[in-house]
């Protein structure tokens, strides 16, 4: 074989090898493409099933919180949550907050709170003793967790707020703006649905605890006017975040602030703060048409702070030590009442629950049950009610619950900031225990030194 033939033969062999290799590569590509198409096709077929399941789950999850049941019979209070946010905040990213409250849907309970746009142990925590600023926002996190940027959900810009769930979506009410012209922004499922303008131009404010929902309608109480004299008070009825009706209370010589409201047998009862001249708590109860009754808790076991020593009560405002006050709550059971209050008569310290079997209508100071919650040597603060509906608990009654704010920092302690943690309890008809569940943080922090 001459050299030219050798070259032609070698070239032919290389060409054949190249063609075979190319065909193998093409076959490999086709095989991969077919395999991918089959997998993609399977995924496309599965997605409608997944979406169908998701939509079905949502449809089942959406209910109407009827609120028609009565409050559950209870004999005491079982501890429900404690977030330890100040202790955790000494080294972790935890919001500076005040006015925490709890509200439950048919699926979960969440802690709502008013931030100061700052974290604990940070320079922006300085001066956060101030109640109303443009930096304050309503946020929420799962109950029992310390509120941080990593687990919290923005709800509204607000220095006064309320929130509740009707079985379909969360309703939030956030008040912000200047003292002489604040506006409440209503959101339903996170979307602005309505607004309420200050009608007396004097610090429009609301509950700082959950609103109450019955049969798809939700209700709240707002105040506008002096904190130390006659003000104006309105009940609002809302449906899917829109105000459908309101009524102004005819309540001369009454003072309502920061009401704690709950449903009971299809009606709403609110127990509030008298910052003008009452050391006992005013109440307002109303039906779904906003037909209302008003009064004061008659018991000689006084519920506000500051207050006189227990004695003879009144079904009107108790004037001794009646000025100023603190947000609180009570639960009515017929003529009886569970009263939550600070242990101290003149400072926001300690907390206890007292059962007065005749206290809603009777003026004596006798009671049959007292359960310690926080020792008098530890700080407390605001407190308020919330409920767990049968749709959440599976019970045939509405479970009464309450939370207590444990304020730390200014003005009572040597810090540059004011914040708080919270604890909560729910009513049970079984064994409970009296103890002290204080905030427990060691102050001052590094930023305070």
Swiss-Prot record:
Q: Which residues are glycosylated?
A: 68, 126, 215
Q: What residues sit in the active site?
A: 131 (proton donor/acceptor), 382 (nucleophile)
> Region (Involved in apical transport and lipid raft association): which ranges?
11-33
Q: Which residues lie on this side of the membrane: Intravirion?
A: 1-6
CDD domains reported in the protein's UniProt record: Influenza_NA (cd15483)
Activity regulation: the record says: Inhibited by the neuraminidase inhibitors zanamivir (Relenza) and oseltamivir (Tamiflu). These drugs interfere with the release of progeny virus from infected cells and are effective against all influenza strains. Resistance to neuraminidase inhibitors is quite rare.
What cofactor does this one take? Answer: Ca(2+)
Q: Which residues form a coiled coil?
A: none
The way this protein sits in the membrane is described as:
Single-pass type II membrane protein
Could you tell me the EC number(s) of this protein?
Answer: 3.2.1.18
Q: Where is this region: Head of neuraminidase?
A: 71-449
User: Which GO terms of the cellular component aspect does the record hold?
Assistant: host cell plasma membrane; membrane; virion membrane
Which residues participate in substrate binding? 98, 132, 257-258, 273, 348
Please give the family membership noted in the entry.
Answer: Belongs to the glycosyl hydrolase 34 family.
Record remark on domains:
Intact N-terminus is essential for virion morphogenesis. Possesses two apical sorting signals, one in the ectodomain, which is likely to be a glycan, and the other in the transmembrane domain. The transmembrane domain also plays a role in lipid raft association.
State what this protein does. Answer: Catalyzes the removal of terminal sialic acid residues from viral and cellular glycoconjugates. Cleaves off the terminal sialic acids on the glycosylated HA during virus budding to facilitate virus release. Additionally helps virus spread through the circulation by further removing sialic acids from the cell surface. These cleavages prevent self-aggregation and ensure the efficient spread of the progeny virus from cell to cell. Otherwise, infection would be limited to one round of replication.
Name-wise, this protein is Neuraminidase
Which organism was this protein described from?
Influenza A virus (strain A/Chicken/Hong Kong/31.2/2002 H5N1 genotype X1)
Give the encoding gene's name.
Answer: NA
């Amino acid at each position: 074989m001459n050299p030219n033939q050798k070259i032609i033969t070698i070239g032919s062999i290389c060409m054949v090898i190249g063609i075979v290799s190319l065909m193998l590569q093409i076959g490999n590509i086709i095989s991969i493409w077919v395999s991918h198409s089959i997998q993609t096709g399977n995924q496309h077929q599965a997605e409608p099933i997944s979406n169908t399941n998701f939509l079905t789950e949502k449809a089942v999850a959406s209910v109407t919180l009827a609120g028609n049941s009565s409050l559950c019979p209870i004999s005491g209070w079982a501890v429900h949550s404690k977030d330890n946010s100040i202790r955790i905040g000494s080294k972790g990213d935890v919001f500076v907050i005040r006015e925490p409250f709890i509200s439950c849907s048919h699926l979960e309970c969440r802690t709502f709170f008013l931030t100061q746009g700052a974290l604990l142990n940070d320079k922006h925590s300085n001066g956060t003793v101030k109640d109303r600023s443009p930096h304050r926002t309503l946020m929420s996190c799962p109950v029992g967790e310390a509120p941080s940027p990593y687990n919290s959900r923005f709800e509204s810009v607000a220095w006064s707020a309320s929130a509740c769930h009707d079985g379909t979506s969360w309703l939030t009410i956030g008040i912000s703006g200047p003292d002489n012209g604040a506006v409440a922004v209503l959101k339903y499922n996170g979307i602005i649905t309505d607004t309420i303008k200050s009608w007396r131009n004097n610090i429009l404010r609301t509950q700082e605890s959950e609103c109450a929902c019955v049969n798809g309608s939700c209700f709240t109480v707002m105040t506008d006017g002096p904190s130390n004299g006659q003000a104006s008070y309105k009940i609002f009825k809302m449906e899917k975040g829109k105000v459908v009706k309101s009524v102004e209370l005819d309540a001369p010589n009454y003072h309502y602030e920061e009401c704690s409201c709950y449903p009971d047998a299809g009606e709403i009862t609110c127990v509030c703060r008298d910052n003008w001249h009452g050391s006992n708590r005013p109440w307002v109860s109303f039906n779904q048409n906003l037909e209302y009754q008003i009064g004061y808790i008659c018991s000689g076991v006084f519920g506000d702070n500051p207050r006189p020593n227990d004695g003879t009560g009144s079904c009107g405002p108790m004037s001794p030590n009646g000025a100023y006050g603190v947000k609180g709550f009570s639960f009515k059971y017929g003529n009886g009442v569970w009263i939550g209050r600070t242990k101290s008569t003149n400072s926001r310290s300690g907390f206890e629950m007292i059962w007065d079997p005749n206290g809603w209508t009777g003026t004596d100071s006798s009671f049959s049950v007292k359960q310690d919650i926080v020792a008098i040597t530890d700080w407390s603060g605001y407190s308020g009610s919330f409920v767990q509906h049968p749709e959440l608990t599976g019970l045939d009654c509405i479970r009464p619950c309450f939370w207590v704010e444990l304020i730390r920092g200014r003005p009572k302690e040597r810090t540059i900031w004011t914040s708080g943690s919270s604890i909560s309890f729910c009513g049970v008809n079984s064994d409970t225990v009296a103890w002290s569940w204080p905030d427990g943080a060691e102050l001052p922090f590094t930023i305070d030194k």
